[in-house]
């Protein structure tokens, strides 16, 4: 069953494409804007710190997502963001850089709230879970190829204020799409449970499902080294290839193209292989891509970027599908938040480690460590297969049975 046959999902996908375009066009330009205002690389780097910080309290967002209706929550969140980004039209000088940081912080919250994935459980029958994740990742990766260039172009030609208005419009489009959806949502988690047990319920459920915990653990271990790439890639371009920093843009585009192709193929592979084997193949292919960076050749660097771009959708789709299938609707937010928090913390540590090791450790050692870690993740999942749990039906599954 393909999710694209579902009219609700098709409209949701359009809204996701439009809002993703605006999001990535703006938040990637915030760093450029901060640098232009202050002349400081550190000030630009703080933008990405503020983007990451909200992810550290993801379980709180997951708790909220499971206690309310997801569609009204998303509408309220997008409406708030449409107003927040318009504050950027007030920025004129370096002493107003705090507005950029406030917007980045708000974006970080938006990216960390797992309401979108939770809503999918109510919209789609279980048979369409894989194709839905594949379509979403393909669209997001496709958008990310064009949106940074478009965002930077609008910023340079018309200024950050105009870019903020464009982004606000994309949020309005997403709101209109959500408002047009007639969704029968599952009942929210009732009140009455103690706060701490309620907030941490996602971690406890995750631990009780061996397949989910194996996939989440592999993702966390992988993120604990992949952040080294954020530093290693610039050292590799400069010292390994002798290329200008602009070559990073070429690598990013090639990786994005690889991920679009990967998204188109990964749905079929995960459906045939299952979440565990599909994820394992993804990590193994990523290791191959990262390994090509050990040889200082522009051709191999580009090939490697395409290969690991191809791999990313495999383990992303596998983990997202497993969460969709094996987690009840009332826990989707908290389990998604638990997985997101583990990955965010691990990635933040590895990014910081990469920055600290720059100039001390050869970039090839960093890439070798990334490749070996990816192989270890593949082995962790594949060598001791976890039993496949029973699918937890959704309200969409129940409707499908009623209409059968």
PLM features per residue range, with description:
Residues 23, 106-116, 307-319:
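Core transmembrane helices of Major Facilitator Superfamily
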Residues 29-37, 88-92, 146-166, 239-240, ...:
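Transmembrane alpha-helix termini and helix-breaking/packing motifs in multi-pass membrane transporters
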Residues 12, 96-103, 214-215, 299-305:
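Short hydrophobic/alpha-helical segments at membrane-entry points of transmembrane helices
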Residues 47, 60-61, 65-67, 71-83, ...:
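C-terminal transmembrane bundle of multi-pass solute transporters/carriers
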